Amino acid sequence: MTDETLRLTARITGVVQGVGFRYWTARKADELLLKGTVRNSADGSVELVAEGSAADVDSIVKWLHSSRAPGRVENVDFQVSDATGEFDDFRIID
C-alpha cells in the first residue's frame, strides 16, 4: 500500500449543470476525504480538481463514470498527477 497523494483534474460533460452535480460531487469528495474544488464552466461542463490518496482518487473517478452521479454524465476527461497540497478542504466554487 502506498501513501502517495495524487491530484485529479477532470472535465465532466453531459447534463451536469442545474441538476445538483456540484453539490453531490462535493459530498462524495468529502466522504472520500478528498480536498479540492468543483465548479461550473461557461461551456456547460463541470471542472473538478481533487487531491487525495490513489485509492480515493480512483473511487471518485469510478463514481463519476457510474449511474450514481447526478444528471447525465456523457464523458469524463481526466488527468492524474502528483498533488500540490494547495487545498485545505473541498469547496464548491460559484
Curated annotation (Swiss-Prot):
Residues 7-94 form the Acylphosphatase-like domain. It comes from the Bacteria. The active site is at R22, N40. Keywords: Hydrolase. GO terms for molecular function: acylphosphatase activity. Belongs to the acylphosphatase family. This is Acylphosphatase. The lineage of its organism: Bacteria, Bacillati, Actinomycetota, Actinomycetes, Micrococcales.
